[in-house]
Amino acid sequence: VGSEMCIRDRRELVEDAMRRQLVSDVPLCTFLSGGLDSSVLSAIGAAAYREQGETLSTYSFEYEGNRENFHQSLFQPQGDDEYARWLGQWLKTDHTVLTAPTEEVARCLEAATAARDMPGQADVDSSLLYFCRRVKARHTVAISGECSDEIFGGYPWFYRPEMLYRDFFPWIHDPYARIRLLKHGLLDPDEGYAYISGLYKKWLAGCDTLEDDSDSMRQSRIATHLSTGFFMTSLLERKDRMSMYSSLEVRVPFADHRILEYVYNVPWEIKFENQVEKALLRNAMQDVLPEKILHRKKSPYPKTHNPAYEQEVLDMLRRRLASPCGILAQIMDTEAFDRMLASDSETWFGQLMSRPQLLAWLYQFDYFCELYKVEFEDI
C-alpha cells in the first residue's frame, strides 16, 4: 500500500508541476532526448496541448558524426537519436532534430565562457548554447528534464555505495587532472585535495538523516543531499547561463520543491525497486509512456564522440599556447601536456568530461584570462 500511495502521489505532483510550467503567452516547446525525464514531461505536455486542439513542439539534439563514432560507457550506454525520433512520432509532436556541426561546437567555447563568466563544462556548455540559439529562432520558452536524476536517484553513486565512501565527491574521478598540467610549484596539489576532501566530509556530516534509517535509506539521503547541493546546482547554472545568453527561457518542472520534499522521504527500496534506478518515477508513469522509453537505461545530455572535434580543439589550443599574450603558455608544464595527449582518454569529471573536454576547458581557461585580464604574480 505504501508503494502504491507513493506512486500515485508522485504522479500527481509531476503532472501538476508540468502543467503549471506550460502556462505561457509566447511560443513554448520541450527538449526531448528520448530519455525517461524529458519523455515524461513531453508526454504530459503533448496531452495538455491536444486538449486545446494544439500540437506540442519538441526538439532533440545530436552532433555531426556521432552516429559513426559513438562509444558506449557506464554513464552513456546508448545514443539518443533513435529514441527521440521514435517518441516524437509516438506522441505526435512537431519534432525537430538539431545537429551541431563540429566547428560550431568548438567555436562557441568562447561565447560559453562569456556566458558563464568563467571556464565551465567545455563543449557540454558550448553545444547547449548552440542548440538554445537554434531553438530561440522559433520558440521563447522551453521545458527541460533537469533535476530528476538528483531527486529520484538516477546517478550511479545512488546505488553504488563505494562511490560515496571515499575522500571526495563521487563525480570527481581524477582531482589532479588539471593541476598536474601546471608547472611544478605553481599550486600545491595536496592543499587543493585537502580543501575538496574537507568540503566533501563537511557536506556528508550535514546531511539530514533519521536514527532509524536503514543503511540503504541513509545512503539515499546522502546521495540526494550531495547531488542537489552541488551537481544539480551546477547543471542548473549551466542551463540558465546558456539559455538566457541566447534569450531563451528554460523551465525545469522537476525542480518543484514539493517533489524533492516528498521523494527525499520515500524509502530507497521503493525508489530502487527490482534494482532499477528511478523505479518510483517509472512506475508512476506506466500508462504515460511506451515500454521502450519507460525502461530505457539512463543516458545523460549527449557529448560529441567525433574525433574531429578533439583535433579541432587541440589545434585551437595550440594556437593559444603559441600566442605571446596567453597566460596558459606561461603556467603549462609542456611535458605533462604531451604525456596527457599520448595517454588514453579517461573520464576525469562528471559523466562526460574526458580528454577532448579537458582540452576545451584549457582553451576556455586561457580565453577567460584574456577576456577578464587575469594576471598571476610570480610567473
Where in the sequence are the language-model features?
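Short beta-strand segments
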Residues: 30-33, 57-62, 97-99, 143-147, ...
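ATP-dependent adenylation/pyrophosphate-handling site
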Residues: 29-31, 36-82
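A mobile, often basic/glycine-rich helix-loop segment
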Residues: 152-177
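Adenosyl-5′-phosphate
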Residues: 124, 141-143, 175-379
